[in-house]
C-alpha cells in the first residue's frame, strides 16, 4: 500500500522519536519469514521492550538522521526490519538471535549502539549483554564480597587462636552488663 506524503511524515516522525530514545538498533533481513513467525516475533518484541517495525529504507534513513544511528544510514538497503531496544541495549540482539536460530532466513545486517556501527556478527555480543537486573546483581555481588572476605578472615583468626564462638560469648555477656 502506497503512503501519501502526510503518512510518510508520520512514519518518519514516529521512527525518529523511537530512534532518539533507543539504546541500540539492529536491522535484519526478513525475506522468507512467514506471517505467523513475524507475528510471534512482534509479540515477543512487545514483551521485551523492543520496537520492531518494517518501513521503507528511505524513510528509515530520514528518521535516523541526527541520532546515534545515523552512522548506519548508508547500510540500510534491501528488505529490512528494524529492531530498536527501548529498555535494555541487548534486548533487540537477544530477540533477533533467538528467532534466527529457528529461521535461517532472518539475518542481522546492521548492528549499531552508542553511535558506533558494528558488523552483523556483533549481534551475538549485543545479545550477551546482561539485563539490568543481572547487572545490578553482579554489582551487588562485587560490592558485598570484600565485607564477606573480611568476616571470614576475622572468623578464621578467632578459630586459629582457639577462641571462636566460645571466646565471643564472654565478651557478649560483658557487653550486656
Swiss-Prot record:
Family matches, as InterPro entries: Ribosomal_uL10, Ribosomal_uL10-like_sf, Ribosomal_uL10_bac, Ribosomal_uL10_bac_type, Ribosomal_uL10_CS_bac
Keyword flag RNA-binding: yes
GO biological process: translation
Keyword Ribosomal protein recorded: yes
Alphabetical list of Pfam families matching this protein: Ribosomal_L10 (PF00466)
Domain of life: Bacteria
GO cellular component: cytosolic large ribosomal subunit
GO terms for MF: large ribosomal subunit rRNA binding; structural constituent of ribosome
Gene3D superfamilies in the cross-refs: 3.30.70.1730
Keyword list, A-Z: Ribonucleoprotein, Ribosomal protein, RNA-binding, rRNA-binding
Role of this protein: Forms part of the ribosomal stalk, playing a central role in the interaction of the ribosome with GTP-bound translation factors.
Matching HAMAP family: Ribosomal_uL10
Assembly behavior: Part of the ribosomal stalk of the 50S ribosomal subunit. The N-terminus interacts with L11 and the large rRNA to form the base of the stalk. The C-terminus forms an elongated spine to which L12 dimers bind in a sequential fashion forming a multimeric L10(L12)X complex.
Family designation: Belongs to the universal ribosomal protein uL10 family.
Protein's UniProt name: Large ribosomal subunit protein uL10
Organism in which the protein naturally occurs: Xanthomonas campestris pv. campestris (strain ATCC 33913 / DSM 3586 / NCPPB 528 / LMG 568 / P 25)
Amino acid at each position: 500500500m502506497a503512503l501519501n506524503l502526510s503518512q510518510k511524515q508520520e512514519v518518519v516522525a514516529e521512527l525518529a522519536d523511537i530512534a532518539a530514545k533507543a539504546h541500540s538498533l539492529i536491522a535484519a533481513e526478513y525475506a522468507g519469514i512467514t506471517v505467523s513467525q513475524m507475528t510471534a516475533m512482534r509479540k515477543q518484541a512487545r514483551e521485551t521492550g523492543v520496537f520492531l517495525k518494517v518501513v521503507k529504507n528511505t524513510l528509515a534513513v530520514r528518521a535516523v538522521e541526527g541520532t546515534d544511528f545515523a552512522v548506519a544510514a548508508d547500510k540500510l538497503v534491501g528488505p529490512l526490519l528494524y529492531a530498536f531496544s527501548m529498555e535494555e541495549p541487548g534486548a533487540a540482539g537477544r530477540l533477533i538471535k533467538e528467532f534466527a536460530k529457528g529461521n535461517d532466513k532472518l539475518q542481522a545486517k546492521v548492528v549499531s549502539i552508542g553511535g558506533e556501527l558494528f558488523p552483523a556478527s556483533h549481534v551475538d555480543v549485543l545479545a550477551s549483554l546482561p539485563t539490568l537486573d543481572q547487572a545490578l546483581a553482579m554489582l551487588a555481588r562485587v560490592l558485598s564480597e570484600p565485607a564477606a572476605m573480611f568476616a571470614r578472615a576475622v572468623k578464621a583468626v578467632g578459630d586459629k587462636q582457639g577462641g571462636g564462638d566460645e571466646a565471643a560469648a564472654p565478651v557478649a555477656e560483658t557487653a550486656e552488663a
